[in-house]
Amino acid sequence: MDCMHNRYTVSAIVSALALLCSTPYAAAAQEPPAPVAAAPSTPEVSPPQAAPANPPLSAPETTPAATPAPAGEPPAETPAAGPLPEAQPGAPPPLPAVAPRRLATRSSHQAWVAAANPLAVEAGLEILGKGGKALDAAVAVQAMLGLVEPQSSGVGGGAFLLYYDAGTGKVSAIDGRETAPAAAAPEMFLEHGRPMSFVEAVRSGRSTGVPGAIGMLYTAHAKVGGLRWKELFEPAIRAASQGFKVSARLAMFLGEGSPFPPTTEIRALFSRQDGEILQEGDLFQNPEYAKTLQRLADEGPRALYQGTIASQMVTATHQEPLPGTLSVKDLAGYRAAWSEPLCRPFQGFTVCVPPPPSSGVALLQMLAILERTDIAKRTPNDPQAWYLFAQASRLMYADRDRYVADPRFVPVPVAKLLDPAYIKLRASLIGPRAGAPPQPGSLALNRGRDATNESAGTSHFVVVDAEGDVVSMTTTVESIFGSGRTVAGFVLNNQLTDFNFEPTEGGRPVANAVHGGKRPRSSMAPIIVIDKGNNFVAALGSPGGSAILEYNAKTLVALLAWKLSLKQAVELPNLIARGETFSGELGRFSPALLAGLRERGIELKTGHAENSGLHAILRHTDGTYEGAADSRREGVARMLPPVQKPAKRAVGAN
């Protein structure tokens, strides 16, 4: 998919703001509402009334909690999967068995981590081994990912998180999406009235929003953490100080062939002592990042949202080219808040996703459309199954691009998008052959179409602790290495390029237009699946820009409708269908299947976007667990052999 706007001459339209005095950081320490796990009636999401300010955070206590010794057994690693059976001429083959051979490690022990880098997985397992809870391990995983996979996520980015409480069977959501500065202007990505080049916008100071991942994790930890906040950064601080070997993937994105060639700042941060850019296998130490993590450990999120680091972020975003408007007041005012997830039935299970500005509602709509077809009776080698998948995807994107945005600023018609009568109407538009791109449904909202381009600098991970609590978290700096600007050893996001560059389309306002204080719409949609008894079934998610929704939907269809094993579901080919574009992994589809799609009007082309990076954990009905990591990236799924139960929650555990 081409993600470039036409390039036009730069005109300076934003002047640098004077730095404002900091106000006390008050990242949300809100109590979560009674979260839902079943499928309640969904109200339309509308801009709420002004909410009272969240109470201020105090610095974390420094008294360490007593921790049991970690288990001494080495964790087991998930092996790679083999190919699916080839399609047979004339008729699709029988559905593969649920698990014809061991495709992923399976265990009755509940402590698991699946993430995009083995060192991040080990960091999470280390915390679980000390008796930590799932949320504790999530903090450690994110801290390590910011070191070993900095091109995808980190301290300077944002995230969405779902949390499953095994004691209550409930699912909660928390929004750590980046926020536009108060002075952000609707036209800030326009030049002479036209959208500027996408790369030009990405590498500008205007692209950076207030990062939310750390504020979100601290808010979540205050409610559902077990160990002290300070302990959770120890693995990443140790690795940043002592060094780690650069992975092939990190080295690839530092190379000249990267879709976003490294900026001068990125090259300076990720270079050897001789000045050459890091190569695969080089030992990389990041002492500045270690200092940042130590400050976060000692001071909590104040270390990021106030003081020296906050001032450095503001200074970095006010540099040419195209300086932005981020202020210390914007940073100090960041809030993360608990909310109820959106949960809907699919194939006898309940699928839960975050509410807007996540695009989880679009994923639920696509699944609902597919349930109006016979896709569940088909197999993954049947061209008709993939045709139905593609058409449902196109319908989903048409509605998503028009209606989904930050509900604090525009009404999002969640209930209407998921209404059974509306779903039936949308599904009826799927004919025998692919035609022109479908139009969005008429929901009595005068909105323009959103043409936002979404990059793929993102990561997803899943944690299950010894008590069965679960974290499913998608985290991002947006594009590869975010804005290309760095401070204190980490990368700043370019999340504001997830807004539509033009505030109107055809004279109608665009829901996802830029506005000060607004959070851009996101395709990130971490998933937790539960059964009718509110028991945990699966947690999964993926990076991949706007294709995240299709990567997730493919995996859910394969797992819940086609009854494939977890690893088979993750490794199925990816197919992307949005508007006029049909792309996919041609080498993973059989010639017979591709021919069948051509007969139905779909000519797949090789995709230009970054591939999926699915990570998932599944609980079987016999109580055993299975983890899977997408072979398209460097991730692993590993379990921790018998561990002590998580430490009991102490008052003020932050």
Where are each of the predicted segments found?
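Bacterial N-terminal signal peptides that target proteins for export
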Residues: 2-13
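Bacterial N-terminal signal peptides
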Residues: 11-23
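Compositionally biased, proline/threonine/alanine/serine-rich low-complexity intrinsically disordered stretches
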Residues: 27-98, 647-654
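Noncatalytic scaffold domains of N-terminal-nucleophile
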Residues: 82-122, 126, 134-135, 139-300, ...
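Active-site rim segments in enzyme catalytic domains, especially the processed small/beta chain
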Residues: 147-154, 158-173, 190, 324-327, ...
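Short beta-strand scaffold segments in enzyme catalytic cores
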Residues: 153, 158-165, 459-463, 526-528, ...
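Internal maturation/activation junctions in enzymes
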Residues: 372-476, 485, 607-608
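Extended C-terminal subregions enriched in glycine
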Residues: 517-520, 552, 561-609
